[in-house]
Each structure stands twice: as C-alpha cells, then as structure tokens.
C-alpha cells in the first residue's frame, strides 16, 4: 500500500459535504463482529447472500499494528470495527495478500524477472506455487474479503506511465523484434493488444485460483477500479478490463489522499468519483452480490493520525454512496519493537477519541436508516450521491419511503440482491430455496 498525508485544512466545508451525523451515544450501539455460514457466495450458483440486518455498512481493520504482542488492547470491538481473530493480518474477516506467487516484472536494476513482461511470462509452476501460498493462509470456511495486491504494473497498457513506462517501451521493442517491418503506429497497436491479453491471462488466473481455494471469499484486486483524468477516460479505460469486473466478487478501490494542495471540494470530488466508478462497474459488469470496500488510510507514513474531519469524508461519503463498508489500512513501520509501546498507546487513544466514535456514528446512522426506510433489506443512499439513478429519480424513490421517518428524507433504498421495491419490501422470485442468511460481507444489488 502507499502512504497518504493529511491536509490539515479540511474542516468545515468538507464535513458538511461528507455526512451529516446524528450525535449517537457511542455506548448504545451494538455490532456483530464475526462471520457465520451463509447460503449464497462467490462459489455458489445461488449468489444472494445478505449482510446481517444491523450492518449495512461495515468498517474492517487491516492494520498490522502488532499491539497485541505487547498485550496492549485496542478497543476495536467497542466501536463495531471488524477485525480478524487474534488480530492476525491474514485471517477469517480479511486477507490482503501481497505474495500471490510468481509475477513477471522488471526489477529496479532492469533485470527481467519471470520474463519481465506479461507477454513473456515463463514460470514453470505458477499455478502450483500460487495455490500453495493461498492454502497456507486459508482460514476454515473463509467468507471474508480477499484482496490481491500487485502494483508493479497495471492491467491497462496505456496507464503504465511514469516509472512504469518501461513496460510500454519493452512491449514495443518485443513486437519490433518479431516484426521489424512494422511502423511505429502498428508496433504500438500490436504491443497494446498483446499486453492487454497477457495481463488478463495472468490476473484472471490468479483470481481464479484464489476463488477456487477459498470459494466463499469476496475476491478482487486492490486499486481496482480507479479513476483517471476525467470521467470519459475513466469509463473508456475501465471498460477495457470489464473481464476483471465480471470475475471479481469484491471491489477494492483506494481513496487515499496524496496531494496536499487539493482544495476541500477537490478532495471530496476525488472520493466521490472513485467510489462512484466502483458503483458503476459493479452495476454494469459485476455479479449482483459484489461488495464495494474502498481502502482508507487513517495514519500517514509520517506517523500523523488523520483528523476526524478528514475521516468523515472517507467513511461518510463511502457510506452515503452505498458502499458495503471500508477497509482501514496503515503501515507497520511505526510499530517496530523499539517504539511499539508508545505507538500503540497513541493508536489506542486515537481509536478511543476520534476513530472509534466516528465509526460507531456512521455505522449506526446507516443501520438506523436501513431499518427505518428499507425494512433492513437494503442500504440507504443519499439522493445527491447516487451515480446511477441521479438526484431526480432518487428523490422520487425517497418520497415513497422516507415519509416513514423524516430524519432520512434525503435518502432512498438500494436493495440487497434478494429484495426489490422502492422500500425493499418484496422478496424477489428466485430459483434458490431461501433460508436464514447472514453473509456479513454482502454487496447488495442496485435498483433497476
């Protein structure tokens, strides 16, 4: 993962645009924190698993802090933050996998590893090694979030720029060796075509193996989907890899903030655009139960905790747009043995005073809204933040249900995949035999 730096000026305006939060008593809300078996998963013919009725929005801890090793308790469960048992990094709730077997890449010294390019990938035991690594970390009956993290090159040829330009250059060189008579335009066109196919073969195969080893997990790649220069370019590029959205059973974009100089509205727009693009590809291409969990950084590489106002953008806006939850990630570099005691005490205090109460507030509000206007069968989406329906249609749906609870008059329902109707009041006809379902990670379907 990459670092993010806090912009200290994000205070009044951004808070207003992120999420209006009622002042809940943080001690009053309850939250389930463990998975249970469910019908309907990425490995089933009947893919209609549901989250628990009290958890339309979940916050998942994926921070390798190591505080439990010194017996310093982080009060995650007090605020409904989901975490792996024994606080392991690879566990039953979430697995972010940096090592998924051999990949082709070019080292910093220019050495071609495993062929260097996807087109030249030549590892003799790729599948076997990938399977062994995944099985080594496989929890029993895994139903959690499965995240493959590979960032050395990108699936879309044209997005390998900056330090990754070498992959475009070497791809063109490879074609030229085979076809010295081609002009530059044709060389580039063929190089792009060969790259796209080879990258697809490798990434799709890794994903397939993960889904076979842990078929009930929600599998996808970190940083996919992402946004580019503008919405037109973003759609064009991401549609080129629609095969990835069709195969993924989890979408894990990043909403880390890198640029100090961005204005408050620009930062809010970035988060909105990124989550919105995930909603779009989920609607157009992904299985109906595919959850969206943006990755959120709450502590920078410079060891600065994000202010509450900044976290409200990341958590609040994701919730308002209908994401299934967020993943909280941080670096382990601050939690080395020499400084771990002090760092863990600082982290404990941050959770108690800032992060924890905010998580409780956001999750409780989305729970209350779901129960009030969606009968607990869907997520609430803010009328001004539905990238699929638009504000006019959102308001029409809102008027049908929000009269039940005026507090949520600016929200409408996005039903879970087993339900339909403006207020998610009708069980959809299904070839599947219904039973009590508790898929804690379910993504929910969008209303057509």
From Swiss-Prot:
GO molecular function: hyalurononglucosaminidase activity
Pfam families per record: Glyco_hydro_56 (PF01630)
InterPro entries: Aldolase_TIM (IPR013785), Glycoside_hydrolase_SF (IPR017853), Hyaluronidase (IPR018155)
Annotated signal sequence range: 1-18
A GO term from the CC aspect: extracellular region
Active site positions, chain numbering: 151
Catalytic activity: Random hydrolysis of (1->4)-linkages between N-acetyl-beta-D-glucosamine and D-glucuronate residues in hyaluronate
Residues carrying sugar: 141, 169, 361
Protein location: Secreted
Location (main, coarse): secreted
Keyword Acyltransferase found: no
Keywords from the named record: Disulfide bond, EGF-like domain, Glycoprotein, Glycosidase, Hydrolase, Secreted, Signal
Disulfide bonds: 67-344, 369-380, 374-413, 415-424
Region annotated Disordered, chain positions: 26-55
Listed PROSITE patterns: EGF_1
Domain of life: Eukaryota
This enzyme's EC code(s): 3.2.1.35
Domain EGF-like: 413-424
Miscellaneous comment: Found in both injectable (milked) (IV) and dissected venom (DV).
Similarity section: Belongs to the glycosyl hydrolase 56 family.
Function: Hyaluronidase catalyzes the hydrolysis of hyaluronic acid (HA), an anionic, nonsulfated glycosaminoglycan distributed widely throughout connective, epithelial, and neural tissues. In venom, they are known to enhance diffusion of the venom by degrading the extracellular matrix.
Descriptive protein name: Hyaluronidase conohyal-Cn1
Organism for this UniProt entry: Conus consors (Singed cone)
